[in-house]
């Protein structure tokens, strides 16, 4: 894969420095279960807008992270070329989630409205805080409350009233002035 349609590609990790002389690389996983990154194959490795498919043939835990060996990488010199490359996969490989659960990528771009009908803006990003996820909502340019951005906790049944996936809308119980 070189520069095909990348709209369905999601980043799940990053390659680190080479490890040893046999072509192993350090792996930094961004998945909820860090070892879960190895459940997906093949990996799409991206650098400077170019993508290449690599097959993981072996992996191990190493210190607080992981190391991996690829079929296409045979020595340290070849491994150096992949240092700091993004590890991605096709979103079609993601498992289906139970009712009421969402991937962050599915929430980005949704409009956010209060239960009273006030348009708060569009989900621009999400943050993980430890206790709960937080929606980063970019407010409309003519927001009546002068807000540029709102941080809204993703707490189902208290703040998040409903997520209408097909309508691309999230209804919240939230004060627009906050």
From Swiss-Prot:
SUPFAM superfamilies hit by this protein: PRC-barrel domain, Translation proteins
GO biological process: ribosomal small subunit biogenesis; rRNA processing
Primary localization: cytoplasm
GO molecular function terms noted in the UniProt entry: ribosome binding
Keywords of the record: Chaperone, Cytoplasm, Ribosome biogenesis, rRNA processing
Subcellular location(s) per record: Cytoplasm
Domain PRC barrel per the UniProt entry, residue ranges: 99-178
GO cellular component: cytoplasm; ribosome
NCBIfam families registered for this protein in UniProt: 16S_RimM (TIGR02273)
Comment field on protein domains: The PRC barrel domain binds ribosomal protein uS19.
Subunit architecture: Binds ribosomal protein uS19.
Chain's role: An accessory protein needed during the final step in the assembly of 30S ribosomal subunit, possibly for assembly of the head region. Essential for efficient processing of 16S rRNA. May be needed both before and after RbfA during the maturation of 16S rRNA. It has affinity for free ribosomal 30S subunits but not for 70S ribosomes.
Family: Belongs to the RimM family.
Protein name per its UniProtKB record: Ribosome maturation factor RimM
Gene that encodes the chain: rimM
């Amino acid at each position: 894969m070189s520069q095909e349609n990348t709209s369905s590609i999601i980043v799940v990790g990053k390659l680190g420095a080479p490890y040893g002389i046999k072509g192993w690389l350090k792996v930094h996983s961004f998945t909820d279960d860090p070892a879960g990154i190895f459940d997906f194959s093949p990996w799409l490795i991206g650098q400077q807008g170019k993508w290449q498919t690599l097959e993981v043939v072996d992996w191990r835990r190493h210190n607080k992270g992981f190391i991996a060996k690829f079929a296409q990488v045979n020595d340290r010199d070849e491994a150096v070329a992949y240092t700091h490359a993004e590890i991605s996969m096709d979103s079609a490989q993601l498992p289906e989630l139970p009712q009421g659960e969402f991937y962050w990528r599915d929430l980005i771009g949704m409009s956010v409205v209060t239960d009273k009908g006030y348009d708060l803006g569009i989900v621009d990003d999400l943050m993980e805080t430890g206790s709960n996820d937080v929606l980063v909502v970019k407010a409309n340019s003519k927001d009546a409350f002068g807000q540029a951005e709102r941080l809204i906790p993703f707490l189902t049944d208290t703040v998040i009233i409903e997520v209408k996936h097909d309508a691309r809308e999230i209804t919240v119980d939230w004060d627009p002035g906050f």
